[in-house]
From Swiss-Prot:
It catalyses: D-mannose 6-phosphate = D-fructose 6-phosphate. The lineage of its organism: Eukaryota, Fungi, Dikarya, Basidiomycota, Agaricomycotina. It comes from the Eukaryota. It comes from Cryptococcus neoformans var. neoformans serotype D (strain JEC21 / ATCC MYA-565). Involved in the synthesis of the GDP-mannose and dolichol-phosphate-mannose required for a number of critical mannosyl transfer reactions. This is Mannose-6-phosphate isomerase. Transmembrane segments: none annotated.
Length: 434
């Protein structure tokens, strides 16, 4: 019989985009939860992984794989979850839980839906490593900046009319077609008061025009892109001819060009929403939606997959054709991507629920002042908890375990647990229920 609540050791990934040394929150937490881990101040630490994904699986204190332990003790996953998710019978969790520390921008990317994931896995298993989809949710731990989906079409059109370096890659007939579909003029100079963002969903015709615009930019000749970006950067550095609609994007374009000189992703500041999340705010990214994390520390939860289709801001393989063909081409204000938390339990404001519209996971955020307690109702599936601030005690029946910042705790299915803060506590708990 296995205990229902126990600590596990996560894995840590070092990628170039991670924050360096002790500046990385992922690395700070790893010093507690990964045996013999010490921070190298010259190394970038990007991700703390919690879960059963084979690329960096979590382990128990005796070094047993968490997946092996769960396979031997299926009651920890619970029968309803095992019935719903076939892989759970092998001890796999249907979600992957992470802490990300982002120092430089990640690639402009999207994740495939299930049918496309299977097709890509069948055709290119060396690139796309599994046949699963990867919807994901990000919760800000520090101020977090990201590209999230396409701009409202009226705003995107204004950029097409005013940014000469963008105009080089988009045929004027596409700009005219987009303007016509929106009932907006293309006269110069544009009357900016007409180009207000709206939440009206894009029509099929507008989505097709947007697809052609995005394809034209992302597949443009590399040398021509570099020359256009060089002109843009010189213009911005000289603070010359900057239109009102460009002003908020200047610093970001300069920063992205510093990180990825001459990369087509720099021009995506004119196509994608730039969204800043404050601590505790969350965004949900469904399949086939373009995004790129730019800076900050986040909690991230996703379906168990490592599939990424990239097309910009990256030295890695770019699969432009796949990305262009797969996107939904929804276009709306960035706040449409935000996910509002709700109380997890009536009358308890210590724990908020982030509940995206998918089956594989939900996430709780619990905050307790020193000496406070809260109980979480039994969850009919497995949970992973990471302590991001403070220290305390968790109780399950007669079992009691102390924890500190950085600890990662597994909670088995169907168990009520009580949390008590010894020091002001912040904890995130990812779980699945069927």
């Amino acid at each position: 019989m296995s205990p229902s609540v126990f600590k596990i050791s996560p894995g840590i990934n070092s990628y170039d985009w991670g924050k360096k040394g002790s500046a990385s929150l992922a690395a700070q937490l790893a010093t507690t939860s990964i045996p013999d881990f010490s921070i190298d101040e010259d190394k970038a630490y990007a991700e703390l992984w919690m879960g059963t994904h084979p690329n960096n699986p979590s382990r128990l204190s005796d070094n047993t794989l968490l997946s092996e332990h769960l396979k031997s003790h299926p009651e920890l996953i619970g029968s309803s979850v095992s019935s719903k998710f076939e892989d759970c019978k092998d001890g796999s969790l249907p979600f992957l839980f992470k802490v990300l520390s982002i120092g430089t921008a990640l690639s402009i990317q999207a994740h495939p839906d299930k049918p496309l994931a299977k097709k890509l896995f069948d055709e290119k298993p060396d690139v796309y490593k599994d046949p699963n989809h990867k919807p994901e949710m990000a919760i800000a731990l520090t101020p977090f900046l990201a590209f999230l989906n396409f701009l409202p079409l009226s705003v995107l059109l204004l950029h097409l009319l005013t940014v000469p370096e963008l105009q080089e890659f988009v045929d004027s007939s596409l700009t005219e077609s987009l303007a016509s579909s929106l009932g907006l003029p293309t006269s110069q100079p544009p009357d900016t008061s007409l180009f207000k963002p709206t939440e009206s969903p894009a029509t099929a015709e507008q989505k097709d025009i947007l697809k052609q615009i995005f394809a034209a930019l992302m597949s443009a000749d590399k040398k021509l892109v570099e020359e256009a970006i060089s002109k843009l950067i010189k213009r911005y550095q000289a603070k010359r001819d900057i239109k009102e609609n460009e002003k908020s994007l200047v610093d970001l374009a300069l920063r992205l060009n510093d990180q990825y000189p001459g990369d087509v992703g720099v021009l995506c500041v004119f196509l994608l929403n730039v969204v800043e999340l404050k601590r505790g705010e969350a965004a949900f990214l469904g399949a086939n939606e373009p995004h790129a994390y730019i800076e900050g520390d986040i909690i991230e939860c996703m379906a168990t997959s490592d599939n990424v289709v990239r097309a910009g801001l990256t030295p890695k393989l770019r699969d432009v054709d796949t990305l262009v063909s797969m996107l939904t081409y929804e276009a709306a204000p960035g706040n449409k991507q935000l996910l509002q938390p709700t109380p997890f339990q009536k009358g308890d404001d210590t724990t908020k629920l982030y509940d995206p519209p998918i089956a594989e996971f939900s996430v709780l955020r619990t905050e307790l002042s020193k000496g406070m307690k809260t109980s979480h109702r039994p969850v009919e599936g497995p949970s992973l908890c990471v302590i991001t601030e403070g220290e305390g005690v968790v109780r399950n029946g007669n079992d009691r375990s102390e924890f500190v910042r950085g600890d990662v705790i597994f909670v088995g299915a169907g168990k009520e647990v009580e949390w008590e803060a010894i020091k002001g506590l912040e904890m995130f708990r990812a779980y699945v229920e069927a």
